[in-house]
A protein has these predicted regions:
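Structural signature of the two symmetry-related core transmembrane helices
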Residues: 150-165, 246
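Helix-loop-helix hairpin linking two adjacent transmembrane segments in secondary transporters
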Residues: 21-62
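A membrane-interface helix-boundary motif in multi-pass transporters
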Residues: 38-52, 231-249
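Intracellular juxtamembrane helix-capping segments at the cytosolic ends
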Residues: 1-9, 189-202
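A late C-terminal transmembrane helix in Major Facilitator Superfamily
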Residues: 205-234
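Helix-to-loop junctions at the C-terminal end of transmembrane segments
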Residues: 40, 135-147, 233-234
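Cytoplasmic helix-loop-helix junction between adjacent transmembrane helices
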Residues: 1-23
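C-terminal membrane-cytosol helix-exit motif in multi-pass small-molecule transporters
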Residues: 51-71, 255-259
C-alpha cells in the first residue's frame, strides 16, 4: 500500500496524503486497547472481535483495480545500493519500530510499577495512539510547507525528550493523557516522514525496493526493541522503560547528522 500511495502521490501533496495514511494506521493502534477495554483480556472474545475487524478491513480490496505504476531505470535494484543512498531513513525505521514496539509491550508493566490500574494503562495507550491519528494530519500538512528533514529532526528530538519526561508526567490525572496524546502524534510522524522521504527520493522499482527494505527494517526493529528494552528493564528495573526507549533515539541521532553531512 505504501508503494502505490507514494508512487501516485504528487510531491506537493505527499505530506498530507501520507499523513492521512499514517492516521489510518494509528487509528488501528488506538482501536486495539479500546477493544480490550470493552471485551476484557480474558477468554476468546477479544480474538473474535479482532478477527472480525481484520475481515471487515479487507472488504474494500474486492473493489480495487489493478493499476500499473511507472518503472524505474533499474529493473533489478540492489537493496544494498538503496541502503547506501538513504541509511538514515532505513535506520530511522529500525529505531522507530524498536521504540514503539517496546513501548506498547512494556507500558502496562511500567504502569503497574508506578501505580496505574490496568484500565488506566490501556486508556493511556489508546490516547497515545489517538495522538498519532489526529496529529499526523496537521504535521503532514507541515511536511509540505517546510524542509522535511528539519521536521524529522524536530519529531525525533521531541519524542526522545518526551520519553525522558514520561515518568514524571504520565501518572498526573489531567496532564498525563494530554502528554501521551502529543507524544503519540510526534512519534507516529517519525514513521510517516520516513515514508514521505522515500517517496521524495525514489520512483518505480527503486521505490518498491526501498519500501521493501524499509519494511524489513521495521520487522527487525520489532524484534530487537522489546528484546533489548526488556533486558534493560531486567537489569535496571521496570521504571527504566521510558529512559531505555529514549536511548534508542539518542543512538540514532548521530546517524542522522552523519548522513546529512555526506
Amino acid at each position: 500500500s505504501e508503494i502505490v500511495i507514494n508512487e501516485l502521490a504528487d510531491d506537493d501533496w505527499r505530506g498530507r496524503i501520507i499523513g492521512i495514511y499514517g492516521s489510518a494506521g494509528a487509528a488501528g493502534f488506538a482501536l486495539g486497547p479500546l477493544v480490550l477495554i470493552m471485551t476484557g483480556t480474558d477468554g476468546l472474545l477479544p480474538f473474535v472481535v479482532t478477527a472480525i475487524l481484520v475481515a471487515v478491513a479487507g472488504l474494500p480490496l474486492f473493489w480495487l483495480r489493478n493499476e500499473a505504476v511507472t518503472d524505474g531505470h533499474d529493473s533489478h535494484p540492489s537493496l544494498m545500493r538503496i541502503f547506501r543512498l538513504v541509511p538514515d531513513i532505513m535506520l530511522l525505521n529500525l529505531a522507530y519500530a524498536a521504540a514503539v514496539e517496546a513501548f506498547l509491550a512494556f507500558f502496562p508493566l511500567f504502569g503497574i510499577h508506578i501505580g496505574l490500574t490496568e484500565a488506566r494503562s490501556l486508556s493511556l495507550l489508546a490516547t497515545f495512539a489517538l495522538g498519532g491519528v489526529v496529529l499526523q494530519l496537521p504535521l503532514g500538512w507541515l511536511a509540505d510547507r517546510m524542509r522535511r528533514y528539519t521536521l524529522l529532526l524536530v519529531c525525533v528530538v521531541t519524542t526522545m525528550l518526551g520519553f525522558l519526561l514520561l515518568p514524571h508526567i504520565v501518572s498526573l490525572k489531567a496532564s498525563g493523557p494530554a502528554f501521551t496524546f502529543v507524544l503519540g502524534g510526534m512519534e507516529g510522524m517519525i514513521y510517516a516522514l520516513g515514508v514521505i522521504l522515500l517517496g521524495q527520493r525514489f520512483r518505480g522499482v527503486d521505490l518498491a525496493a526501498a519500501s521493501v527494505l524499509f519494511t524489513g527494517m521495521w520487522g527487525a526493529g520489532t524484534m530487537l526493541g522489546p528484546a533489548l528494552v526488556g533486558a534493560g528493564m531486567d537489569l535496571l528495573g521496570d521504571q527504566s522503560m521510558p529512559y531505555l526507549i529514549a536511548a534508542i533515539y539518542a543512538v540514532y541521532l548521530p546517524i542522522f547528522f552523519i548522513a546529512r553531512r555526506t
